[in-house]
Curated annotation (Swiss-Prot):
It is found in: Cytoplasm. It comes from Saccharolobus solfataricus (strain ATCC 35092 / DSM 1617 / JCM 11322 / P2) (Sulfolobus solfataricus). Manganese or magnesium. Binds 1 divalent metal ion per monomer in the absence of substrate. May bind a second metal ion after substrate binding. InterPro entries: RNase_H2_suA (IPR004649), RNase_HII/HIII (IPR001352), RNase_HII/HIII_dom (IPR024567), RNase_HII_arc (IPR020787), RNase_HII_hlx-loop-hlx_cap_dom (IPR023160), RNaseH-like_sf (IPR012337), RNaseH_sf (IPR036397). Its main location: cytoplasm. It is an enzyme of class 3 (hydrolase). This is Ribonuclease HII. SUPFAM superfamilies: Ribonuclease H-like (SSF53098). Its cofactor is Mn(2+); Mg(2+). GO terms for cellular component: cytoplasm; ribonuclease H2 complex. Belongs to the RNase HII family. Endonuclease that specifically degrades the RNA of RNA-DNA hybrids.
Amino acid sequence: MRVGIDEAGRGALIGPMIVAGVVISDTKLKFLKGIGVKDSKQLTRERREKLFDIVANTVEAFTVVKVFPYEIDNYNLNDLTYDAVSKIILSLSSFNPEIVTVDKVGDEKPVIELINKLGYKSNVVHKADVLFVEASAASIIAKVIRDNYIDELKQVYGDFGSGYPADPRTIKWLKSFYEKNPNPPPIIRRSWKILRSTAPLYYISKEGRRLW
């Protein structure tokens, strides 16, 4: 048995970061590879959604941790990621996985130490979601769940594009919302530095660990 873990929305300005984990046997890994499971960023949304159902019904189990903007604004993002990884591994531990594969983000040492401390072999590498099917499967789970969550937010707050700071639609929406509303919406990450220029009164520094 192998565990694969990946995230979606780490760098987003809007919405949660979704961290997903799957546990799967080697035999089923071959099946998923054969049907085209790969890094979610290389797939269209339609293809991701089709593969989501197949992945969910093929893996032994999957689990998801949502990390919301207010958490990201008050704690170190890497620490939140490590905490999510720990929760996922513990929730899948009953399957006795041999190894845990995680996409490397930043310094891999804390993740390796965490996995080893929990009693498992670690495989923490850059582009794990491209190189290892178990991580690719987790990336599809994470991305589809985040996409659907973002769709729900748009029903309430309007179309803000992808929710990433590099998206002009997202910035246009933020500026428009800022002009009309003195209070920030709970869906944005107020500690993102782009707010300094686009919505300065919404911006908070992580240093103060201020809550909403």
